[in-house]
Amino acid sequence: MARKKLKKRKLLISLFFLVSIPLALFVLATTLSKPIEISKETEEIDEQQVFIDSLSGHAQILYEKYHVLPSITIAQAILESDWGNSELAAKANNLFGVKGNYKGHHVTMETDEVEKGKRKTIRAKFRKYSTFFESMDDHAQLFVRGTSWNKKKYKPVLEAGNYKEAATALQTSGYATDPDYADKISAIVEKYDLDEYDEVNPSLKSVDLNASIKDSAVQDVWSKPSTDDRSIRLTSAQSYVGKDIKVVSKKQKGQSVWYQFQINDKLIGWIDDSAVEIKEAT
């Protein structure tokens, strides 16, 4: 009788292991096969930093030329274009909501305006640009040239000693109708530490070069030179082999030279110059 009970117990134990081990292995395999989920917030923060990195170098180049604070340029681009995702940015490369025509080109779209404390929607013509950089160039020149009726309209923006003064000057000069515009710009600068770009960077140069990625390139493409803090790897250079690229910015740091490039007027990222074959200047 005791032997029968012992056999029965052994049988139950064997059945337990036969069932539980495969089940455990199945659960483990299922868990390992699932991709690691990245929260939407984390992904969004990365995309935002990539957007900032794509504009910061050119904003510093423009600062040296026109004295518009880079923090203001970037913050306005963020606010006005929703991080480059607005319909106006997509259709017209217009980052700042600048109205009118640009070299005969424009798009007509709806926009919200505040008049006598009331918000209303109107249809207006907005300038259409070839690239984001062209939009930034025109934006800086707008502050320099003023308007047809007041050449010094935006002079206080250019003379501002810091981003808070510049944001206030934007508000008082009538750049935007939103009564909270200055506060919104300052808040963006502070949240993303954009004032760290408010200096002339002599290592940065604007260029215009036709080029291609070398077939043998093993380098990566970055949101800004990988030697810089908080640079984000975007993709491998091999993704762009065989495609014509346009080099639009150059940065030298020690013995390293980096190029910012675009394809079909769209900014891509930064890459070490050893991966690039320059064809000719345009």
Swiss-Prot record:
SUPFAM superfamilies xref list: Prokaryotic SH3-related domain
Cofactor(s), by name: Mg(2+)
Gene induction: Expressed under control of sigma-A RNA polymerase.
pH dependence: Optimal pH is about 5.7.
Protein keywords: Cell wall, Cell wall biogenesis/degradation, Glycosidase, Hydrolase, Magnesium, Secreted, Signal
Residues of the signal peptide: 1-29
Activation and inhibition: Inhibited by EDTA.
Family: Belongs to the glycosyl hydrolase 73 family.
Function: Is the major glucosaminidase responsible for peptidoglycan structural determination during vegetative growth. Catalyzes the hydrolysis of 1,4-beta-linkages between N-acetyl-D-glucosamine and N-acetylmuramic acid residues in peptidoglycan. Acts processively from the ends of the glycan strands. Also plays a role in motility, chemotaxis and cell division.
Protein name: Exo-glucosaminidase LytG
Species assigned in the record: Bacillus subtilis (strain 168)
Gene name tied to this protein: lytG
